[in-house]
Amino acid sequence: MTDLYAVVGNPIAHSKSPLIHRLFAEQTDQDLVYEALLIDTEDTTFQFAISDLIARGYRGINITVPFKLDAFELADELSPRAEVAHAVNTFSFKDGKIFGDNTDGIGLVTDIEENANRPFKDQKVLILGAGGAVQGILQPLLEKQPGLVHIANRTAKRAEVLGKRFETFSPITSSDWEGIPDQAYDIIINGTSASLEGKLPPINSNVVGQDSLVYDMMYGAEPTIFMQWAQQHQPSCQVRDGLGMLVGQAAEAFYIWRGVRPQTQSVIDEVRRLIQA
């Protein structure tokens, strides 16, 4: 019997997750169907929508904007990484219980360490933004033992609060945009959504070194404005968008559900080709 899975969110029509999971299923010879489903909160609640999917026999669900906090609150049991992130992007349904997990961080770490070939260990890391996206990546990143992590945000207080929450994993410094220490970083991660609006975080270009990896968690058909900005200032730096993170978090969810870990680079290449077509 074919197993049912889906991604839920609002909006959802743009989601690449059904394509990604179809490619994973083909690669690993798994019998499943994966759909993108809109949850319209004018017609229903998140809790009712999930109950309906369970009743219809779905085995697991991915959760995207704006329901990751609702998912965190609805889960009967949480993985340690979801508990720390205070957000859930993956549900598994088993024995009448909802298990919540967060695969965003492992998606980013895998993409940077394996696909970009840049281990975090002992590296100087600058993270831009202190919202939900950054919250979800911090624990897996810090477990890789970077040498230094600085979180910068429009409001320094939010960055400071986030840093304190995760300081048991690794020492973290924080500031507003103006307070970023004036030095080059090995890895720079843009966890803001500024690129979606064609905007840049107001930071000094000195943070980009000749050998920096500059990573934007957003992605599109063209290099993001943040990637373009980095290469204008340091043509030799390495730039990468968040498509690999998207595929990486999907691969981790696929592994949770199916017990099989798919290879990601070929899927990244295929999705990129279709986005650019």
Swiss-Prot record:
GO cellular component, one term: cytosol
Enzyme kind, highest EC tier: oxidoreductase
Source organism superkingdom: Bacteria
Catalytic machinery residues: K68 (proton acceptor)
NADP is among the record's keywords: yes
Keyword hit for NADP: yes
EC id: 1.1.1.25
Matches recorded under Pfam families: SDH_C, Shikimate_DH, Shikimate_dh_N
Reactions that this protein is recorded to catalyse: shikimate + NADP(+) = 3-dehydroshikimate + NADPH + H(+)
SUPFAM superfamilies: Aminoacid dehydrogenase-like, N-terminal domain (SSF53223), NAD(P)-binding Rossmann-fold domains (SSF51735)
UniProt keyword list: Amino-acid biosynthesis, Aromatic amino acid biosynthesis, NADP, Oxidoreductase
Residues holding shikimate: S15, K16, S17, T64, N89, D104, Y219
Gene Ontology biological process terms from the UniProt entry: amino acid biosynthetic process; aromatic amino acid family biosynthetic process; chorismate biosynthetic process; shikimate metabolic process
Pathway entry: Metabolic intermediate biosynthesis; chorismate biosynthesis; chorismate from D-erythrose 4-phosphate and phosphoenolpyruvate: step 4/7
Assembly, per entry: Homodimer.
Listed NCBIfam families: aroE, PRK00258.1-2
HAMAP family (alphabetical): Shikimate_DH_AroE (MF_00222)
Name by which UniProt lists this protein: Shikimate dehydrogenase (NADP(+))
Organism: Hydrogenovibrio crunogenus (strain DSM 25203 / XCL-2) (Thiomicrospira crunogena)
Classification of source organism: Bacteria, Pseudomonadati, Pseudomonadota, Gammaproteobacteria, Thiotrichales
